[in-house]
From Swiss-Prot:
A motif ('HIGH' region) lies at residues 123-133. The gene is argS. The lineage of its organism: Bacteria, Pseudomonadati, Pseudomonadota, Gammaproteobacteria, Enterobacterales. It comes from the Bacteria. One of its GO terms (cellular component) is cytoplasm. Its main location: cytoplasm. It is found in: Cytoplasm. The keyword Cytoplasm applies. It comes from Blochmanniella pennsylvanica (strain BPEN). This is Arginine--tRNA ligase. Belongs to the class-I aminoacyl-tRNA synthetase family. SUPFAM superfamilies: Anticodon-binding domain of a subclass of class I aminoacyl-tRNA synthetases, Arginyl-tRNA synthetase (ArgRS), N-terminal 'additional' domain, Nucleotidylyl transferase. GO terms for molecular function: arginine-tRNA ligase activity; ATP binding. It catalyses: tRNA(Arg) + L-arginine + ATP = L-arginyl-tRNA(Arg) + AMP + diphosphate. GO terms for biological process: arginyl-tRNA aminoacylation.
Length: 581
């Protein structure tokens, strides 16, 4: 049930009846922010009345006469200067909420299926994942879940950094050190590889001969040298294994089969360069192959040049990104491509899109979206780091969250078994970390706060999870079979019941907004609001001890729909529920 969509159809018919023109693009229907303004507000009539040269008061009254909401609204009010406030009919609300109880998928209307590629997480090989990867990973995963839930064909793309200069440096360092060559015959930790990388980078920056050697190894890799490809694969496999452990722990739906890293496109790069040359987009400049973009200018005011092949024959990240876009459009046939990557990549990404578009690789109908993410900050307002000033490893963050959750649960439930404490602590800690990320507008920076994250009050995962445990407890005490609930319709008597039911009916329009904007904080705000409304309902409306059997079943039914909605919403965030806390 999508109330906004339902009302828009009614409005469209009314406008056609009044004006013979829809003026539909000028109309907005939104949820009212204050109860005195009803449940929904229609905006846009002022603009239409001006176009028709009719006084707004006269046009608004005429509009109300033509909009057919007799069974839907008990009151329709004109609010100056020209807004229409709609107060929904309680009986209509009851009918719709009863329909949701019987419907599958919470009554959500499936979307017209599109193929949507979501590029997220994308850690670099030979480095441990750190807190900087968290936002892209959890936000991208949540949006993938939401779009799949709506019926879209979602392709999860983990575009890992498994190619390029860093591998030339690593291989050069390994080849020049007998001790490191020996270690390649054993299973080594990713932290050891990262140490190799740091040492290689130091040497690369100060030793021109080592830097030249590293670049030569990059070329050998790109040309398919078997020996160096074997070393490269070993490095990649260790990294993937470690990253998959993090994904499993975070309940992220990224599998090894979702990895389409930079190396995947290597064999396509010669054809990309050749094609761009043939189309007159790429030219030779100082020995390199360059695409000049007229919309971008350097400091001298001349068109900015994007190098796609160096004079030594090596390819660049920009070449890979162009090949990647072509593959997603021409092979995967994407209708929409969403990138959850660093904001610092914005210009680079847009330039690659422009080149791909000029080359004819992107259909006009394809939506390209770069959803930038803000930064995770410490209490000092600076990027969240360790005391030593290094980026905090994601594993370290998860370990600390687990320990904090374990202590919290033990303080509330001292008699719980150790295994139960660990199980609860894992679910609560992961939920708290993910929700803390997902509940913030992805564009803004935010300050990381352990105390707020694990708080059982406010817009947090524990608060929403606790609402679920309350409902579990109600049904455990009531021992009512589902067939009894099916036989009884929901009857809304109190304001608490009505407000809860309306919020439940707004689930679909919220999910559609999340899918369109790629913004899971909208879902978090909804789940928090629903939890608050359920708490008010729980405190003010006796359920098991209701004044008659019909009201008891009605309220149990309303509680069950609430639990289904909360569980579904949390699952779309990648967060699990618990039966007790």
């Amino acid at each position: 049930m999508n109330i906004q969509k339902f009302l828009l159809k009614k409005i469209h018919r009314a406008l056609l009846a009044i004006t013979n023109e829809s003026f539909f693009h000028l109309i907005q229907v939104q949820q009212s922010t204050k109860r005195k303004f009803g449940n929904y507000q229609i905006n846009g009539l002022i603009a239409i009345s001006k176009k028709l040269n009719i006084p707004i008061e006269e046009f608004a009254k005429k509009f109300i006469q033509f909009i057919n909401l007799n069974d839907v609204a008990h009151t329709i009010k004109i609010e100056k200067p020209g807004f229409i406030n709609i107060f929904l009919n309680t009986k209509w609300i009851s009918n719709q909420i009863n329909n949701i109880f019987s419907a599958s998928h919470l009554g959500i209307t499936p979307a017209t299926p599109k193929t949507i590629v979501i590029d997220y997480s994308g850690p670099n090989v030979a480095k441990e994942m750190h807190v900087g990867h968290l936002r892209s990973t959890v936000i991208g995963d949540s949006i993938a879940r939401v779009l799949s839930f709506l019926g879209h064909n979602v392709i999860r793309a983990n575009h890992i950094g498994d190619w390029g200069t860093q591998f030339g440096m690593l291989i050069a360092y390994i080849e020049k050190n007998a001790q490191t060559r020996f270690l390649l015959n054993k299973t080594i930790q990713l932290s050891t590889l990262e140490h190799f990388y740091r040492e290689a980078k130091k040497k690369y920056d100060i030793d021109p001969d080592f830097a030249e050697l590293s670049r030569n190894y990059v070329l050998k890799l790109q040309k398919g040298d078997k020996h160096y490809r074997q070393i490269w694969k070993y490095l990649v496999d260790i990294s993937i294994l470690n990253n998959q452990d993090i994904y499993v722990r975070l309940n992220i739906n990224l599998k090894k089969s979702d990895i389409i890293g930079e190396s995947f496109y290597n064999d396509m790069l010669p054809d990309i360069v050749s094609d761009l040359k043939n189309k007159g987009l790429a030219v030779t400049s100082n020995g390199a192959t360059v695409v000049f973009l007229e919309n971008y200018h350097n400091k001298l005011g001349t068109p900015f040049g994007v190098i796609i092949q160096k004079k030594d024959g090596a390819y660049l990240y920009s070449t890979t990104d162009i090949a990647c876009i072509k593959y997603r459009c021409k092979v995967l046939h994407a209708d929409r491509i969403i990138y959850y990557i660093d904001s610092r990549q914005k210009q680079h990404l847009i330039q690659a899109w422009e080149i791909a578009d000029k080359a004819g690789y992107i259909e006009k109908s394809v939506l390209l979206e770069h959803h930038m993410c803000g930064m995770l900050l410490g209490k000092d307002g600076k990027p969240f780091k360790t005391r030593a000033g290094n980026a905090l490893k994601l594993k370290t963050l998860l370990d600390e969250a687990l320990e904090r959750a374990r202590c919290l649960i033990l303080s509330k439930n001292p008699n719980l078994k150790y295994t139960e404490i660990n199980k609860l602590a894992h679910i609560i800690s992961i939920g708290a970390i993910k929700y803390s990320e997902l509940s913030k507008n992805r564009i803004t920076d935010y300050i990381f706060d352990w105390n707020n994250m694990l708080n059982f009050e406010g817009n947090t995962a524990p608060y929403v999870q606790y609402a679920c445990t309350r409902i579990f407890a109600i049904f455990k005490r009531s021992k009512q079979p589902n067939f009894q609930l099916k036989k009884n319709d929901i009857q809304l008597e109190t304001e608490e019941e009505i407000l809860l039911a309306i919020c439940l009916l707004q689930f679909e329009e919220m999910i559609v907004a999340v899918s369109n904007q790629g913004a899971p904080h909208i879902l978090c705000s909804y789940l928090y609001k629903l939890s608050v409304l359920f708490s008010s309902f729980y405190e003010n409306c006796p359920i098991i001890k209701a004044h008659n059997t019909h009201i008891k079943y009605s309220r149990l039914k309303l509680a069950l729909i609430t639990m289904r909605t909360l569980k579904t919403g949390l699952n779309l965030l990648g967060i699990k529920t618990v039966r007790y806390m």
